[in-house]
Curated annotation (Swiss-Prot):
InterPro entries: Creatin/AminoP/Spt16_N, Creatinase/aminopeptidase-like, Creatinase_N, Pept_M24, Pept_M24B, Peptidase_M24_C, Peptidase_M24B_aminopep-P_CS, X-Pro_aminopeptidase_P. Its EC number is 3.4.11.9. Its cofactor is Mn(2+). Keywords: Aminopeptidase, Hydrolase, Manganese, Metal-binding, Metalloprotease, Protease. It catalyses: Release of any N-terminal amino acid, including proline, that is linked to proline, even from a dipeptide or tripeptide. CDD domains: APP. One of its GO terms (cellular component) is cytoplasm. This is Probable Xaa-Pro aminopeptidase P. The gene is ampp. GO terms for biological process: proteolysis. Mn(2+) 2 binds at residues 449, 460, 572. One of its GO terms (molecular function) is metalloaminopeptidase activity. It comes from the Eukaryota.
Length: 658
């Protein structure tokens, strides 16, 4: 899955005009069946909402108002009650920033969502395509709208402290200013229609899956805080809190987290959470080691801690540590930039390096998940080809979930299944809806990006199949993507290498054809946590230069190719170390440093009729055949009493030759 996902409407199909050829050396036209499709996404009339928001902006003396995507914990994934940017703009993708002035409104998003946003935004909105030449960033557009000493407002809990300071400085140079508006203005527009905050119970995540007790994790964190000579750590990221305390929740769809804050000092551990979410089991689990405090008291307590620190030791007192992703509001409550040390979270770094129990769990859950995918694709092919069943994209996704749910330790999906036929696959974060989605066409490419939560790990896998006869052009595109995926999987690199440096390996074969994809190549994956997990990843984001790949990291490997209105191709395998990023033996050790590589754990066959063997090198062909042999070895026992699926698996894992 590609760096964030959020439910969105639609997938109505309508006719389109002529196809546009891909710039391959030997182009072919796409099949007529593929050319029939197009996405017709709903738009929301935002005129009334914008009018009400502008009225509130006048009342609060704000000329420009910023509406981020994130919640007060800077979550990539949010609960329905925090979907403010979607409500005000109508755009339902997971990433983007809305900016509203008294006369204009703009939505900035990245390349994953250009297609979707262009269809969902109504005529009130200007789409700012992030990263496109001569298109302003949302900060630049905001600064332009604020010229002449105007005031820009934002909810200070929804923007990071570094982001707020950077924007404030840019505005100051332009004669304008940034203010924090404590009452969220979009919430006022939303009114009683805004969904209620979740109130789900929290549950204990057993140590046998976590690999460490929460007491051990807090001890390790305190050692880190002592080394940094800080007064304590104020934690706001939800997955970090869940990981630290070995707890899981259900407050955000597909992500087993819960709304909470925490403060860890050398002698205390405070968890800020609504007490109604605690069960007797959770209370017993935390015992006397953790003090429970009301969720809403975090800001008052942070201010009190900051004041007490200054009174005890004055300005020379040790500062509190705060993640550089924490909110502006939380930073201000601790006294602001001069009184806190903002840094990459030490919990994020620790969480990204899985221990032996977590790595074992990731291996095991991916084998079970692979068995589910094998059963699903065998069933799907039989329904579409042999039985001629009419299945829509949602029917198929529901069947996959039902198959997964039969497996041990299943705890739900890790994101909305992207079940997409034909050109719907070109919408990178496509989400079908019953009643408006497409009927799966066996003569078109079918892309399925899906994942599950298991108590022993989190999965994320994409497979692209064609149940008919793919065109030469489709096979070439698929094989170029496959070559890039193999290049990452087979990479050997010195310790200290970043995901930024590895990214070119996945793109090189597409680049030679003048092609590319507008998303990252890989992201970190949590252990029964968020399917997107920092700080590691493989891609062109600058932050991927900050943290090198290390043994114990679990990372996805998912290059792709998409042609709007035609098809999408993506192949994804989860990588990790020691299993997944692991130390490898090399003939030489230049610089006397360790060398690393990857071990794949995803166990699902690659669509063999989409592979063009003549485009693969001998080593790449061997990789495919070895991988398929490994899948057979690790999964065929699941189908001892299912001869149909076993036969399908045997066919799909047979060696390929040129």
């Amino acid at each position: 899955m590609l760096f964030s996902r959020s439910p969105f409407r639609l997938c109505r199909i309508s006719a389109v005009g002529q196809t546009r050829q891909l710039p391959f050396s030997r182009p072919r036209f796409l099949s007529a069946s593929v050319a029939r499709y197009a996405i017709d996404m709903e738009t929301v009339n935002t005129s009334e909402r914008l009018a009400r928001l502008r009225q509130l902006m006048q009342e609060h003396k704000v000329d420009v108002y910023i509406v981020p995507s994130e919640d007060s914990h800077q979550s990539e994934y949010i609960a329905p009650c925090d979907g403010r940017r979607e409500f005000i703009s109508g755009f339902s993708g997971s990433a983007g920033t809305a900016i509203v002035s008294m006369t204009k409104a703009a939505l900035s998003t990245d390349g994953r969502y250009f297609n979707q946003a262009s269809k969902q935004l109504d005529s009130n909105w200007l789409l700012l395509k992030r990263g496109v030449e001569n298109v302003p960033t949302w900060q630049e557009w905001t600064t332009e709208q604020a010229e002449g000493g105007k005031v820009v407002g934002v909810d200070p809990s929804l923007i990071t402290a570094p982001g707020a300071r950077s924007l404030a400085e840019t505005l100051r140079k332009n004669g304008s200013s940034l203010v924090g508006v404590q009452q969220n203005l979009v919430d006022l527009v939303w009114g009683e229609d805004r969904p209620a905050p979740p109130r789900e119970k929290v549950r204990v995540h057993p140590d046998k899956f976590a690999g460490k007790s929460f007491q051990e994790k807090i001890t390790d964190l305190r050692k880190e805080l002592e080394n940094k000579k800080t007064a304590g750590f104020v934690i706001s990221m939800l997955d970090e809190i869940a990981w630290l305390f070995n707890l899981r929740g259900s407050d955000i769809p597909y992500n087993p987290v819960f709304f909470a804050y925490a403060i860890i000092t050398p002698t205390t551990a405070d968890l800020y959470i609504d007490e109604e979410k605690l069960t007797p089991e959770v209370t017993s689990h935390l015992g006397q080691d953790v003090v429970i405090k009301p969720y809403d008291s975090i800001f008052a307590d942070a201010t009190a801690l900051s004041e007490a620190r200054k009174q005890d030791a004055g300005e020379a007192a040790a500062k509190f540590l705060l993640s550089n992703k924490a909110s502006w509001a939380l930073s201000l409550s601790l006294g602001g930039e001069e009184h806190v040390e903002e840094t990459r979270s030490p919990i994020a770094d620790a969480k990204a390096v899985k221990n032996e129990a977590e790595l074992a769990g990731m291996r095991a859950c991916h084998i079970r998940d692979g068995a589910a995918l094998i059963e699903y694709f065998a069933w799907l092919e039989n329904e579409l080809v042999s039985k001629k069943t009419s299945l829509d994209e949602v029917d198929a996704a529901d069947k996959l979930e039902q198959i997964r749910s039969k497996h041990d330790l299943f705890a739900g999906l890790s994101f909305d299944t992207i079940s997409s036929t034909g050109p719907n696959g070109a919408v990178i974060h496509y989400k079908p809806e019953k009643g408006s989605c497409a009927i799966i066409d066996p003569e078109a490419i079918y892309l399925c990006d899906s994942g599950a939560q298991y108590l022993d790990g989190t999965t994320d896998v994409t497979r692209t199949f064609h149940f008919g006869q793919p065109t030469e052009l489709e096979k070439k595109a698929f094989t170029l993507v496959l070559k890039g995926m193999i290049a990452i999987d087979s990479a050997v690199f010195p310790k200290g290498t970043s995901g930024f440096a590895l990214d070119v390996l996945a793109r090189q074969f597409l680049w030679k054809e003048g092609l590319d994809y507008l998303h990252g190549t890989g992201h970190g994956i949590g252990s029964y946590l968020n399917v997107h997990e920092g700080p590691i990843g493989i891609g062109t984001r600058v932050q991927y230069t900050e943290v090198p790949i290390a043994p114990g990291n679990v990372i996805s490997d998912e290059p792709g190719f998409y042609e709007d209105g035609k098809f999408g191709i993506r192949i994804e395998i989860c990588l990790a170390d020691v299993i997944m990023a692991r130390e490898v033996q090399t003939t030489h050790k230049f610089g006397d440093k360790p060398w690393l590589g990857f071990e794949h754990v995803t166990m699902a066959p690659i669509g063999r009729n989409l592979i063009e063997p003549s485009l693969l090198s001998e080593s790449e062909l061997k990789w495919v055949n070895d991988y398929h042999a490994e899948i057979w070895e690790k999964t065929h026992h699941f189908f001892e009493n299912d001869e149909f699926t076993r036969s399908w698996l045997q066919r799909e894992t047979q060696p390929i030759s040129k």
